[in-house]
Amino acid sequence: MDTSSVQRIRRAQLHVQDTGGSGRPVVLIHGWPLSGESWAAQVPALQDAGFRVIAYDRRGFGRSEKPEHGYDYDTLADDLAGLIVDLDLHDAVLVGFSMGGGEVARYVSLHGQDRLGGVVFAAAVTPCLMKSADNPQGPLTPEKAEEKSAGLKADRHAYFDGFTRKFFSVDGELQVNEVQRQATIGLCLQSNQIAALGCMHAFSTADFREDLKRISVPTLVLHGDSDAVVPFEGSGALTHATIGHSELHVLKHAPHGCNTSHADAFNTALLGFLRSS
């Protein structure tokens, strides 16, 4: 039965959607600055295939508690660990979209893989976005990161309008309809400003290169080839190269928000991995 609840996970109350049942658990970890509702195209497909689907809102986003602190990846990974323990999940597959991929990587480093059966990095920010002398392949410069932060501080409505256009576009052309884009803006606006800025800083600066090397469970890297937000060459391609045993699936002509724009292809790749891992 599909249920929604608010659960105390360590220091934060998280809104959790849990389809229940005895199927293998799949935990969906949303991207910035959205909520669990951004998985609307995945939850029914996974449930119909017999999986137990858990989609939660990260602290500070959606319908979860919005504290003034805790927007670093160690804390966010602890929140995820608390959810997994509280729901007593085993053989779970973690699916991290965009910044959610960072939580997957950091969870493995801090909490191990005993309860996991696999992980998925979907349009994920791993291994390390920030370009530096130590990370010349990083797709994000310090100047661009500061520009993004300043834009969000100046006018969040305008920022989210521009962000969702880039999120869903390939070569400037939207890959979703306007109703879908406006719904995504609505999810963005549910975010707390402190949380949005804190997580923006976290995913812009975090380095997951060592975290990824710890992963030994079956792994899928799923990414759009036309991602303008988290370019494939500086993220998905490197994540796949770092995790030697990982499976790579590149969605053709797909933007960052590929789980919505290319939902059928995304779901086919995800279900194929879940059934084979």
Describe each region flagged by the PLM:
Residues 15-69:
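Conserved HGGG/HGGXW glycine-rich cap/lid loop of the alpha/beta-hydrolase fold
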Residues 32, 92, 96-98:
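Conserved alpha/beta-hydrolase "nucleophile elbow" surrounding the catalytic nucleophile
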Residues 75-92:
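Conserved acidic catalytic loop of the alpha/beta-hydrolase fold
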Residues 105-110, 114-154:
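Flexible "cap/lid" loop of the alpha/beta hydrolase fold
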Residues 130-139, 150-213:
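Conserved alpha/beta-hydrolase catalytic His-Asp/Glu region
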Residues 215, 221-223, 227:
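Short beta-strand/loop motif that positions the catalytic acidic residue
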Residues 228-234:
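Conserved alpha/beta-hydrolase "acid-adjacent" motif
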Residues 254-267:
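Catalytic histidine-centered segment of alpha/beta-hydrolase-like enzymes
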